[in-house]
């Protein structure tokens, strides 16, 4: 079964929920958007190139549509395991990676996987959606899964600058939560690094990119001309979907100076370090 037919045969998560009630990332997926990361495909690919995928045992938290899973497989890992809490998304990713990997339906805080089973753990646009307590639990689980010397690679939404006024940060978080129907809790780049360091990880690389998820240029760069045209067509024929996406776009535009996509690769120290 091809990747395309696999995707088509599996429903999107929240596909039965009204468009005004569904989480924003799944609304964008309903519109036809496949790359749902704040810094775009280029930032993800740069992050993966620094994670050391070749010959590695890789675990991905919250693979969602499975786009990054495909890119990980291109890197030649020894194994791939997705950990996805949503059963529909887990089934979708399982079909996409069939014969080359697997996807388990589990919580990233408690994966059920063996300690020290991974050389690389990847997670994108999922820590942002959690409270600081849950962020810490997920990062700790990633650290548990990693072998000494293993890498944890994350791509998340960051507040900017590091000394952002707290009132601005609060307004941004509230506006973002209203727009995407998820209680998003982005952190500054400095705070993201501190989340990783608190679990004993050592930050090796930090990369950033504009948070331009719905800008025309980014859409074409991430989805291609054909993909951008597909999204435009879907929005043109569904007014509720169009209204919801435009609300998100206005919010992203309003706060664009205070948001970034950030990718960080951190290493679990070896026992003799």
List PLM regions with ranges.
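Class I SAM-dependent methyltransferase Rossmann-like catalytic core
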Residues: 22-41
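Conserved Class I S-adenosyl-L-methionine
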Residues: 205-273
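Class I SAM-dependent methyltransferase SAM/SAH-binding core
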Residues: 65-111
């Amino acid at each position: 079964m091809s990747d395309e037919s696999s995707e088509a045969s599996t429903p999107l998560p929240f596909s039965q929920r009204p468009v005004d009630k569904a989480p924003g990332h799944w609304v964008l997926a309903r519109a036809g958007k496949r790359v749902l990361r704040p810094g775009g495909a280029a930032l993800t690919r740069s992050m993966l190139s620094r994670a050391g995928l070749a010959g590695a045992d890789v675990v991905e938290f919250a693979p969602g549509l499975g786009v990054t899973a495909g890119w990980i497989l291109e890197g030649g890992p020894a194994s791939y395991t997705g950990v996805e809490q949503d059963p529909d998304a887990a089934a979708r990713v399982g079909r996409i990676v069939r014969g080359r990997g697997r996807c388990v339906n589990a919580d990233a805080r408690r994966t059920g996987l063996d300690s020290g089973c991974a050389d690389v753990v990847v997670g994108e646009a999922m820590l942002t959606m959690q409270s600081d307590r849950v962020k810490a639990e997920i990062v700790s689980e990633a650290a548990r899964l990693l072998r000494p010397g293993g890498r944890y690679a994350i791509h998340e939404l960051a507040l900017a600058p590091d000394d952002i006024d707290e009132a601005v940060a609060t307004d941004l978080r509230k506006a973002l939560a209203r727009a995407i129907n998820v209680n998003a809790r982005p952190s500054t780049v400095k705070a993201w690094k501190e989340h990783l360091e608190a679990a004993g990880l050592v930050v090796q690389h930090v990369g950033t990119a504009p948070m331009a998820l719905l800008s025309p240029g980014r859409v074409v760069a991430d989805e291609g001309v054909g993909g951008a045209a597909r999204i435009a067509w879907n929005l043109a024929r569904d007014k509720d979907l169009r209204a919801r996406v435009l609300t998100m776009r206005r919010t992203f535009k309003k706060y664009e100076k205070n948001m970034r996509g950030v990718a960080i690769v951190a290493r679990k120290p070896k026992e003799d370090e």
